[in-house]
Regions:
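Glycan-recognition and catalytic cores of secretory/periplasmic carbohydrate-active enzymes
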Residues: 1-204
């Protein structure tokens, strides 16, 4: 009742306030720490997810944009999962690895905050789902808002688990870019996401 002033009577418990000690779930978390997260990061390396960010930091009209328009989110979600583990199993090596990945991600961000490698790595010939201009195909397949939603979720988890702002600041800059360019104001565009996820990020 006392929290009704927030608009909703129930507040979620921060995941950083929960420690799983049960043997069953403890085994699952340990498997995630030892197998799943390292495998997911290795797949990001092997399948060119990181290369996309490197290419976006050094765009060229000779780069062939392949894969899927939402490939960036594999990096964001893996960092999110790793962040959940860091609060239960502090790991300096893992934290350092995440920081190194975030250096690559930050380098791919455009000056105004826009971060969508499927366009930025080759603005003249972006991914076929991206459209010729920003947000042009948000309602279809570009996944620009979808990518942002996963980025925000990962950035919040990383900040809550580590207290570091390096990922959070990247996400805020992209969110600010969207707020400037999308809306009903003069010079803005009205766009509706074709795939939900940004809404989940807003809830957080």
């Amino acid at each position: 009742v006392k929290n009704q002033s927030h608009g909703y009577p129930i507040d979620p418990v921060p995941f950083t306030s929960v420690k799983v000690t049960d043997s069953f779930w403890g085994q699952r978390l340990n498997a995630s720490r030892e197998v799943t997260i390292p495998l997911a990061f290795s797949k990001c390396e092997e399948t060119g997810r990181y290369t996309n960010f490197v290419n976006a930091a050094h765009p060229s009209d000779t780069i062939k944009v392949g894969g899927l328009a939402f490939d960036d989110t594999d990096v964001y979600k893996t960092i999110e999962g790793a962040s959940y583990l860091l609060q239960t199993y502090p790991d300096k090596k893992l934290a350092k690895y995440i920081d190194s990945v975030l250096v690559i991600v930050a380098a791919a961000q455009e000056p105004d905050g826009y971060l969508y490698t499927s366009r930025t790595m080759n603005p003249k010939h972006p991914h076929e789902w991206a459209g010729s201009k920003r947000w042009e195909k948000v309602e279809e397949l570009s996944h620009e808002f979808y990518n942002l939603g996963h980025m925000v979720e990962g950035a919040i988890a990383h900040y809550q688990a580590t207290g570091k702002r390096n990922f959070l600041d990247i996400a805020i800059r992209y969110a600010d870019c969207v707020c400037r360019e999308i809306g009903t104001g003069e010079g803005q565009q009205i766009r509706v996401p074709g795939h939900q996820i940004a809404e989940m990020a807003l809830a957080k």
